[in-house]
């Protein structure tokens, strides 16, 4: 026996005017907010990732590659000291 859950069918939702009035504002707003978050550099600050011009410095031009399995912590410390 299947019962009625009381939910609106999806087809009714996406064909309603109310759905498109709400989403015609929220979807572009989310896109613009994401674009501003990345373009202003706030994403780099929030997540702590280096900016594109900070990957290589004057003193360190090689790739910071971890090569040892057992001394990886020392290598990470060495790389972070050069920043």
UniProtKB/Swiss-Prot annotation:
The lineage of its organism: Eukaryota, Viridiplantae, Streptophyta, Embryophyta, Tracheophyta. Heme binds at residue 23. Gene3D superfamilies: Photosystem II cytochrome b559, alpha subunit. It comes from Psilotum nudum. GO terms for molecular function: electron transfer activity; heme binding; iron ion binding. One of its GO terms (biological process) is photosynthetic electron transport chain. Keywords: Chloroplast, Electron transport, Heme, Iron, Membrane, Metal-binding, Photosynthesis, Photosystem II, Plastid, Thylakoid, Transmembrane, Transmembrane helix, Transport. It is a single-pass membrane protein. This is Cytochrome b559 subunit alpha. With its partner (PsbF) binds heme. PSII binds additional chlorophylls, carotenoids and specific lipids. Belongs to the PsbE/PsbF family. The keyword Metal-binding applies. One of its GO terms (cellular component) is photosystem II reaction center. This b-type cytochrome is tightly associated with the reaction center of photosystem II (PSII). PSII is a light-driven water:plastoquinone oxidoreductase that uses light energy to abstract electrons from H(2)O, generating O(2) and a proton gradient subsequently used for ATP formation. It consists of a core antenna complex that captures photons, and an electron transfer chain that converts photonic excitation into a charge separation.
């Amino acid at each position: 026996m299947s019962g009625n859950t009381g939910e609106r069918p999806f087809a009714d939702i996406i064909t309603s005017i109310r759905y498109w009035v709400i989403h015609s504002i929220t979807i572009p707003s989310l896109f613009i907010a994401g674009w501003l978050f990345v373009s202003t550099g706030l994403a780099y600050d929030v997540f702590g990732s280096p900016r594109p011009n900070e990957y290589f410095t004057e003193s360190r031009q090689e790739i910071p590659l971890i090569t040892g399995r057992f001394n990886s912590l020392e290598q990470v410390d060495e790389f972070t000291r050069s920043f």
